[in-house]
């Protein structure tokens, strides 16, 4: 009997907002999405804050969104867990963090704190850096240096000076700590194996080579003078009397305070891994601690907050029922539909096929807002002809990745591209008598300007996301409002399966 696939289509960064100004989703011509939204059962889902296990009012993000969708339950995020540990004091007893601190006390060496200097809460949080500085102060560490990666994506594009001033004020207040380097996240947090970028960040932190400035603020000013916003600040070494204030050396300790793994892996490998071939470098003999587990295979790295074991995810449960599934996305979101969707497990489930389409090699995605959506679509249509899959999880990266550029016209084009692909895929699935659930993991493209100052906005939003059910059998079916964790139970109901008890989400079908 021919398969009737149940598909989840995640339009990354496609939120819902009534505001028209700066709304690329509203401005785009999207006849297919509009047709489905207006003629099929639909609702809105919470994709930020408490709805996805983040602090109240915290914008959602792709990692968190896919974790919640795949788990079928609200997954309390690293941001929330670490913040709570600081508040209740457990943070200061953490074994891995104390190991790093004790190493510098024993060797009279230096403690380096590196990570994204941002209150954005997507990859890191400034308060966690303050917690580490507090720990170092409590333990009488004498030499502490910060290697600040600058954001400009999850916060306004030119806001770094505010966060630098905040952390410098804090360090002055406690009498400990100094910024040693600054690097835009474009260089220090690449995730696409562009080692030539990471090498510049590495050279600044380890070799003391790169752009030079007398202070972090002056480094940012120089970058703004060259029309480079925070994300693109060239790795810069802070110098005093012509010498770097600090570099990472043998016997030092490094704590990487980013909690989100995907953009933290490459620079970790460059500094800490024994077997590394991204670029030529000498391996350091250091104590390296990561805030969370970036990759289970990393050797010589200690983890402060280990992974939560999430069992019976949607993928695992469907696999155990003997059904076939496909995960498909382009490079930028491949980890999201695989690793994050599976609850932080790298290994595919039994009968889980994966299709990875390369993202285009462009400096920024406004230069190619179509990204690889057409190639993803072609591959998916080909796979659907195989009559193999019971469940398909698909991600279109465009509304998010192009939304991050802050360029409205490009984001509009991104949404239009995805809509065109959406039409082809839904037509195909309906011909197979399958069903499609259309949703997003968080908002982005629906707000491309900061309403407080009229400037471009590159960050995610706290807006709800759509949830649309398209099938040949939608009569009398209605959908309740809910959260991302309710998607998996809804899909299981559509597949005629009971949800496992671990899934605390509820089916959205009334």
From Swiss-Prot:
UniProt EC number: 5.4.2.12
GO terms under biological process: glucose catabolic process; glycolytic process
Pfam families per record: iPGM_N, Metalloenzyme
Disulfide bond residue pairs: none
Domain of life per record: Bacteria
EC supergroup of this enzyme: isomerase
Cofactor: binding comment: Binds 2 manganese ions per subunit.
Active site: residue positions: 62 (phosphoserine intermediate)
UniProt family annotation: Belongs to the BPG-independent phosphoglycerate mutase family.
Oligomer and partners: Monomer.
Protein name per the record: 2,3-bisphosphoglycerate-independent phosphoglycerate mutase
Native source organism of the sequence: Clostridium acetobutylicum (strain ATCC 824 / DSM 792 / JCM 1419 / IAM 19013 / LMG 5710 / NBRC 13948 / NRRL B-527 / VKM B-1787 / 2291 / W)
